[in-house]
Curated annotation (Swiss-Prot):
Protein name (Swiss-Prot/TrEMBL): Fanconi anemia group I protein homolog
Pfam families: FANCI_HD1, FANCI_HD2, FANCI_S1, FANCI_S1-cap, FANCI_S2, FANCI_S3, FANCI_S4
Major localization listed first in the record, in broad terms: nucleus
Organism: Mus musculus
Cross-link (Glycyl lysine isopeptide (Lys-Gly) (interchain with G-Cter in ubiquitin)): K522
Family: Belongs to the Fanconi anemia group I protein family.
């Protein structure tokens, strides 16, 4: 039979073939095809012949062809055919589809839909035919009557697609079904339907099946719905990641985790590669991705940005055209996230409305961790982004050798966080990916070497962290060694940071150490001073960190880096003898540098103590070096005055005078080394011969210091040739030399005071010597102060910083104020009897703390050891606190004879600084710090006390002090003390938990002070109100507070209409005639601006959320109702309340007779701001008012309030300001300065007026639009007809200033008209909103 069919098919006509096929039964023909197909015998030829004999032009032929198609589809789906045979059959069927009449095409397509619905398909191979059938059906323009209504081919196609998308798709041929639609021409509606269907199927698949489905979906997206496809993929993986994190965090469900992390992240990586590849082929897809993610920034960023989408963006940076846009988007997202976080943390009002989301920085660091799962396509983007953040947001400016941030406090904090995030990205990437470590290290070091004019501390910190993590990465040491070649060209601070960072590597790499020493030796003899400084810094660092065998262990180690982290025994690599020889060679090199400039010597003297303490076996060499140096400037004759050759310390070079030898620092170094030797070495000595020689050296040094002490006390001003008649001007060589010598003497006196205190053992004679040394110090200090007052500038801060160590300052204060031991009383009375010495001790303490605030460390031994500094701060604070609370300022000042601040006031100033320092540098140790100040009981009791409770205890002490001060007579009010107390309370209040009862008590107390105590001191009022506002915003919104204050200001200053009598309110006594303006007025306006910023932020938030909801409605309408986060209705209500209260606030202020100047200017700007915010709120309702809820009543009331209570009085205030300007008095020729001042005031006050009028009119314009759109008359309370009763002309200002008589008359007439128009408004009482 098959042969006959084939032979008949060769005829030119098909008549015989058709006749023969008609004689066959359908089952016979189907069996023939099946047999041939299963056997694989030229089934294609047979099928081609059968189709040739079944023309669609005839009804029988078309039906037979339809049955053949059905039979072949079943054959292909049976799985009995070989792959090539099945493909051949499908190929032939595809070629013949377009011949089918429309009704049969509908039937064929319906068969496929039924097969999918009933899950009759086995392998889905036949689905390749479906797109051809649908395409052919869409070409049928005629109406097809198939029992389903009269529709044309395109409409049937739409109906079939709709049906197909509504049935359940079997999981095993999901991918084939999706690929069906890529070859079908789809309308946007059909496309959305298909995409939504495929996206809903993601959750029903195994993880490994998702990437190929995503690939098909991306191919399909070239037809449209790109944003829906991307949004759906991102949303799916966002939820999957979230679910995975929740499962991992729950121990109970650890066995039920849906998928292992490895599998999930590998799948995500594959999907990201598919998307990036699709974007390379279809750039529009990339643009849609960026548009989608940018739009998401306006609402809730966490709905768009997640670890998956961030990883996708970072992978996208490999496509050059998108690189810059992606990094800009990520930078914006990071900065916005940090700003939002800070805004939320600083406002209780926002915290109650907006839940805190996951920060973008956390997501990025999660991407870094996930990138370990073969995300090589992400790592390069991570590295680039890390460096972009560090370059963009690192410190930009160096001031006095210190990196300085530029901008507002908010932007500074944001920049610091962004820069730190960049460093964390790079460090974590370095830890995870071995392949890119070299690149990260090279880029960091390139920036360290090339950026000599900008701060690079953040890069040095990163470099140090990298080495600390992996000190054994010797394969990278070649790049570090190359960097050493640039040391001589780098700033000293950079060199020190770089060398500290590489310490661990120097300990384990001999070649690196040798390379560094070679560079340092060359630098030691360089012509540039900075290069020699770098060499000295490097050698000192090596001496500190390469211990000679037998050195004492240092419990006071300042540089834990390389000592605790790197567990490498140096002596296992280098012998003890070699190490000692190496260190002694360095000391010999440093000895030669003692003949160089003062700056070099200074570095050595400041560094030798640390070397000695860390490497005690070098003590003999170091002390011998110092001894030899001192002998050059020491007068050995015991009766010779003065005991030091001060002239030799000063060098004259041509016409210039320089300090050659910092003798005071030399003595300081010797004194500290001696003290260390006596406390650490002497107790361990065994009496060896070498030790006896050392003992002789130390004894001789002691004798020299004793002799210097005695002779310095005996020396008079004339002995130094520096009496009061001497020249101290900075313009002559003699004057400069005398200044240098005087400063040296003062430094020597300080060193000797500390030395004698350390050996005194509370001896009365020693304390008398200390007081005599102080008298000598005071003489020169007074002379320099007196001469500096007459001359130009004082000496530089380098020599004016006190040489007393922080430890000594702490011990001295404790002895002076807290030592109550009976045996010490007589000797201490010597020091305590001198008020000037007591003042000096506290002043030096303040100076040391100020130095710590300024630089982060203090001069002297242990000045860079954070632990030692912290311990000294605790001791100092405890003493200052006791002294201030025990002897109040009022008591001390009543019997005070000395000029200047009292000791109690200085103690309070010290307390204010120490509290600030601890919060700035020692935040993690606050609990320990407060515990040191207040011993409350046993250790068990101490452990249960929180930081809030401890801080509250301290706060109460200062509250009592402030209350006592405020309760005193007005003449006894000490403004300086009050300001310091407020500053201390402000600092301590930051330690209180805002939800605690202690915080509420602090707020209530501050409120009570503001309400009950009236002080006319503007500075005190400003500090107190700032404290009040800073507390209030963490408790609730301050808008009602602002309204009450505005009423008080209005009552104190009066109305702009002098005929109106104001009913005074007394909410806050702190608001009085002296403080109401400008102090309180500017404060409340500033606070109102912050509230408006918060409201603007909320409006942007709900506006973005509305956009997101609109987009999500298009994709998944069923989810729209569930997307109620954040609760926009609550936010809208809160916004209305805020704006309504602020309208009443401005209503009061705008009617207040404010003095000319900053108050008027700031108020006009504030009014412009509230109208801009109102306009933004109206625009939001223009966007959402089409929803069923329409315009809420509260919004209508807000519009009514603004129209009746704000806009009219705004115009009155504008006229008031302009009239005040026009009433400026005439100025004679002699008063030109006054004219210029008047001009500046007029220009400043009237400049914001056009902006305000524009803001009002914009608000009214959008109100009109909203009225039309919402069918609600919102303009009924806006009096447009009387809005302009004045003119805004620049020429008016000139007229005022020129005092032209004719113009003056015209202006007066205009004012009269204005007066007449506004008369009814002025007669009403201004207390309607109180």
């Amino acid at each position: 039979m098959d042969l006959k069919i084939l032979s008949l098919a060769t005829d030119k006509t098909t008549d015989k073939l058709q006749e023969f096929l008609q004689t066959l039964k359908d089952d016979d023909l189907a069996s023939l095809l099946q047999n041939q197909a299963v056997k694989g015998r030229a089934v294609g030829t047979l099928l081609r012949a059968v189709l040739k004999g079944s023309p669609c032009s005839e009804e029988d032929g078309a039906l037979r062809r339809y049955k053949i198609y059905s039979c072949c589809i079943q054959l292909v789906e049976s799985g009995d055919l070989q792959q090539d045979v099945a493909s051949e059959i499908i190929g032939l069927l595809m070629l013949e589809v377009h011949h089918f009449p429309g009704p049969l095409l509908v039937d064929l397509a319906s068969d496929f839909v039924g097969a999918v619905r009933e899950d009759r398909l086995v392998n889905g191979k036949s689905l390749e035919l479906l797109p051809i059938i649908l395409t052919a059906l869409a070409t049928k323009k005629e109406v097809l009557a198939c029992g389903k209504g009269d529709l044309n081919g395109e409409e049937y196609k739409r109906q079939l697609i709709d049906t197909l998308c509504s049935v359940r798709w079997p999981q095993r041929y999901m991918i084939q079904l999706t690929s069906v639609f890529k070859d079908v021409c789809l309308t946007p509606e059909e496309m959305n339907l298909v995409v939504a269907k495929v996206l809903t199927m993601f959750s029903k698949l195994n993880l490994q099946e998702i990437p190929p489905l995503v690939y098909q979906l991306l191919v399909l997206s070239s037809k449209g719905s790109r944003r829906s496809v991307l949004d759906g993929i991102i949303a799916f993986f966002r939820e999957l990641d979230k679910q995975h994190r929740e499962e991992q965090s729950s121990d109970e469900l650890s066995e039920l985790i849906t998928a292992p992390a490895d599998e999930l992240y590998h799948v995500e990586g594959t999907v990201i590669l598919h998307i990036v590849f699709a974007i390379k082929l279809d750039c529009e897809l990339g643009r849609e991705l960026l548009k989608h993610l940018k739009a998401g920034q306006q609402g809730d960023p966490s709905k768009c940005l997640c670890p998956f989408s961030i990883a996708l963006l970072l992978s996208l940076t490999r496509i050059q055209r998108f690189e810059e846009q992606v990094f800009d988007l990520l930078k914006t997202s990071v900065v916005k996230s940090f700003k939002d976080l800070q805004l939320l943390q600083g406002s209780k009002f926002l915290q109650t409305l907006v839940p805190q989301r996951t920060c973008v920085s956390t997501m990025i660091l999660e991407v870094v961790r996930n990138s370990v799962h073969s995300w090589d396509h992400v790592t390069q983007g991570l590295i680039e982004f890390g460096f972009i953040l560090m370059d963009s947001y690192g410190p930009k400016k160096i001031l006095d050798g210190k990196a300085v941030e530029i901008g507002t406090s908010l932007s500074k904090m944001t920049n610091q966080h962004a820069c730190k995030l960049g460093a964390n990205i790079l460090l974590e990437t370095f830890k995870i990916h071995e392949m890119i470590r070299q690149e990260i290290l090279e880029q960091v070091l390139n920036r360290v070497v090339t950026r000599t004019s900008s701060p690079i501390n953040h890069f040095l910190d990163l470099f140090s962290d990298i080495i600390m993590y992996a000190p054994l990465i010797l394969q990278n040491c070649s790049k570090v060694t190359e960097t050493f070649d640039y040391l001589t060209f780098l700033p000293l601070q950079t060199v020190q940071g770089l060398l500290k960072a590489v310490q661990p590597l120097l300990k384990i790499s001999m070649s690196m150490r040798d390379s560094l020493i070679l560079v340092l030796r060359k630098a030691m003899f360089a012509s540039q001073l900075d290069a020699r400084k770098s060499a000295v810094a490097g050698f000192l660092l090596l001496l500190k960190n390469f211990k000679v065998l037998g050195s004492l262990p240092s419990s006071q180690c300042t540089q834990s880096i390389g000592v605790t982290q790197v567990r490498v025994d140096v002596h296992s690599r280098y012998s003890a003898v070699a190490n000692e020889t190496f260190c002694l060679e360095i000391i010999d090199s440093l000895k030669r540098s003692l003949g160089q400039q003062a700056d070099i010597r200074l570095m050595l003297y400041d560094g030798f103590y640390d070397v000695l303490r860390r490497n005690s076996q070098l003590a003999s060499s170091i002390m011998q070096t110092l001894f030899s140096q001192l002998k050059q400037f020491y007068e050995p004759e015991p009766d010779l005055l003065p005991p030091l050759k001060l002239g030799a310390c000063v060098l004259t070079q041509g016409s210039q005078i320089f300090l050659q030898e910092p003798l005071d620092h030399l003595l300081s170094c010797i004194q500290h080394c001696l003290a260390w030797y006596k406390s650490r070495v002497v107790p361990l000595q065994q009496g060896d011969e070498g030790e006896e020689e050392e003992e002789e050296l130390y004894s001789e040094l002691d004798d020299m210091l004793e002799s210097i002490t005695v002779r310095m006390i005996k020396s008079e001003l004339e002995d130094f040739e520096l009496d009061k008649s001497a020249d101290f001007s900075q313009n002559t060589n003699v004057g400069i030399k005398n200044n240098i010598c005087a400063c040296l003497i003062m430094g020597v006196c300080e060193v000797l005071m500390e030395y004698n205190f350390s050996i005194s053992n509370f001896s009365k004679s020693k304390f008398e010597e200390i007081l005599s040394l102080f008298t000598c110090y005071k003489k020169f200090s007074d002379i320099l102060s007196e001469k500096a007052g007459k001359g130009k500038a004082k000496m530089t801060s380098k020599v004016s910083d006190s040489l007393l160590s922080l430890k000594f300052v702490s011990d001295l204060l404790t002895a002076l104020f807290r030592d109550s031991i009976q045996s010490h009383e007589e000797s201490l009375s010597v020091l305590r009897s001198s008020g000037e010495f007591m003042h000096y001790a506290v002043n030096v303490t303040l100076q040391k703390i100020q130095q710590l605030i300024r630089t982060g460390h203090v001069s002297g031994p242990d000045g860079q050891n954070p632990d030692k500094i912290f311990q000294n701060l605790c001791d100092i604070t405890r003493v200052l606190l006791w002294r201030y609370t025990s002897i109040p300022t009022s008591v001390e000042e009543s019997g005070k004879k000395e000029k200047g601040k009292s000791i109690s006031l200085l103690c309070l100033e010290g307390l204010q600084k120490t509290f600030s320092v601890v919060l700035q540098f020692y935040q993690p140790k606050v609990q320990q710090f407060l515990q040191a100040l207040d011993v409350m009981g046993t250790e068990e009791e101490e452990a249960g006390v929180t930081v809030t409770q401890r801080a509250s205890f301290q706060i109460r002490q200062f509250q009592r002090s402030l209350l006592n001060l405020l309760s005193s007579e007005e003449d006894d009010f000490n403004s300086k003390e009050a300001l310091l107390l407020i500053a201390v309370l402000s600092t301590l209040s930051r330690l209180l938990e805002p939800t605690s009862p202690q915080f509420v008590q602090m707020l209530s107390w501050t409120s009570k002070i503001c309400k009950e105590y009236s002080q006319e001191d503007a500075s005190f009022c400003k500090s107190l109100m700032n404290l009040f506002f800073s507390l209030h915003v963490l408790y609730k919104s301050p808008v009602t507070l602002l309204r009450d204050l505005s009423q008080d200001i209005h009552g104190q200053l009066g109305d702009i209409d002098q005929d109106v009598e104001i009913e005074k309110t007394d909410h806050f006594a702190v608001v009085n005639l002296r403080t109401a303006a400008p102090t309180v007025c500017l404060l409340v306006l500033s606070q109102a601006e912050k509230v408006l910023e918060e409201v603007d932020w909320l409006i942007a938030k709900i506006k973005g959320s509305a956009n997101q909801e609109t987009l999500s409605d298009k994709v998944t309408p069923e989810d729209a109702s569930s997307q109620a986060v954040p609760p926009t209705l609550l936010i809208e209500k809160a916004i209305v309340m805020q704006l309504g209260t602020l309208v009443t606030f401005f209503h009061e202020l705008v009617q207040t007779a404010l003095p000319s100047g900053s108050c008027v200017d700031t108020l006009l700007k504030g009014l412009s701001k509230i109208y801009s915010t109102l306009t933004a709120f109206v625009k939001y309702y223009l966007q959402v008012c089409q929803s069923s809820r329409g315009i809420p009543n509260t919004v209508e009331k807000l519009v009514k309030l603004s129209g009746s209570h704000l806009t009219p009085v705004c115009y009155s205030f504008i006229s008031y300001v302009q009239n005040k300007s026009s009433d400026a008095p005439k100025c004679s020729e002699k008063e030109k300065a006054a004219v210029s001042t008047t001009m500046a005031k007029v220009l400043r006050e009237t400049k914001p007026i056009p902006n305000l009028v524009f803001a009002i009119e914009q608000y009214e314009k959008f109100l009109i639009q909203l009225s039309k759109k919402s069918k609600v008359n919102l303009m009924q309370h806006m009096k447009l007809s009387t809005s302009r009763d004045f003119k805004i002309k620049g020429s008016v200002l000139d007229m005022v200033l020129r005092e032209d008589e004719e113009d003056e008359n015209e202006e007066g007439t205009a004012s009269a008209h204005t007066q007449q128009d506004r008369e009814p408004a002025k007669k009403r009482r201004k207390k309607c909103l109180s």
